[in-house]
Swiss-Prot record:
Localization of this protein: Secreted
EC identifiers of the protein: 3.1.1.-
Catalytic residues identified in the record: S186, D357, H386
Entry's family note: Belongs to the AB hydrolase superfamily. Lipase family.
Organism, as annotated: Mus musculus
Cellular-component GO terms for this entry: extracellular region
The name this protein goes by in its record: Lipase member M
Keyword entries, A-Z: Disulfide bond, Glycoprotein, Hydrolase, Lipid degradation, Lipid metabolism, Secreted, Signal
Amino acid sequence: MSEILSRVWTVSHRVEIWLLILVAYLLQRNVNSGHLPTKAADPEAFMNVSEIIKHKGYPSEEYEVATEDGYILSVNRIPRGQTRLKKEGSRPVVLLQHGLLGDASNWISNLPNNSLGFILADAGFDVWMGNSRGNTWSRKHKTLSIDQDEFWAFSYDEMARFDLPAVINFILQKTGQKKVYYVGYSQGTTMGFIAFSTMPELAHKIKMYFALAPIATVKYARSPGTKFLLLPDMMIKVLFGRQEFLYQTRFFRQLFIYLCGQMILDQICSNIILLLGGFNTNNMNMSRANVYVAHTPAGTSVQNILHWSQAVNSGELRAFDWGSETKNQEKCNQPTPIRYKVRDMMVPTAMWTGGQDWLSNPDDVKTLLSEVTNLIYHKNIPEWAHVDFIWGLDAPQRVYNEIIHLMKQEPNLPQGTCRVKL
């Protein structure tokens, strides 16, 4: 066994070395050629979330929110839009939650008329954007250091159980409102399905749940990334350790910004961005590519990746399996992982799905649709893949305007299960 692990370790290092050699070759080739067209790096590639918001001419606020288990999360806010710069009293509150390896910048990476965060602010909403524990902006804890394994002992279980309640309660306390609209994307929807089905008191604080590229199960996911997740847990730990996964170091951030600034590498850059979720290249603004790669991947824990590995293998929405009945009993009060029941969620829910989405696969979506008790609206966009929901050029026309319409229609919707037409 030790010999096998040693070989895997050697292979992984060889892959890294060859990758660096390839990157160095591309860099040297581009620099020496001189005549290759180069795009100037967008200044937003070097900004944090608050700086991007201000750069676009919007008011920006940033807060730190402490969770019950000690993590300190960064939360960004756009309190009003460009057309409403004066304070005019309270506005309906919206919380946007990014997906796996994402951050709050995912909602503001495009131009203001193409980014959901800015569109909602201009439509009269008070916009808040979360950052899950372990990503670029949420790497603090009251007692733990990021150098400790204990800091990274979390998955989307804890994000649903601790992060969402902490952020939602903070927002309600800060704004004086009683309920929020929740918009989740990818893993952000997984957090919502778990939190709102297991914590009724939290679910009562949600006016309406908008699920973009929803993921409850990944039984039929066909992304190349899910093939990697079929590896045994031990193999994943050997390859990536026990702490953080795909945290973007300053070196690689600068490297990706440079590479995606080379016009000749546009196709390669777009392929890398789209590789995990499916291809719909013509629907992306590639002039923003260096902004995308400067902030994503934003990192998570290896344990979170292990949890997704377990989800791929089980085909179910379950709590993290800690590897022994004793540890599961300690963490979950039962010897086997809890199986979450989406049917227990009563929040009015609207969903948008993509026919070419490799992660939120249509077959998994079909199962999910049958389990959402209070589904008020569903729209499938046949040619859309995974990232279209946050970066697609036609996202405002095909999804965002419908979200705003439902939000403004919400006070007049009948209580209980209903269907709406747009």
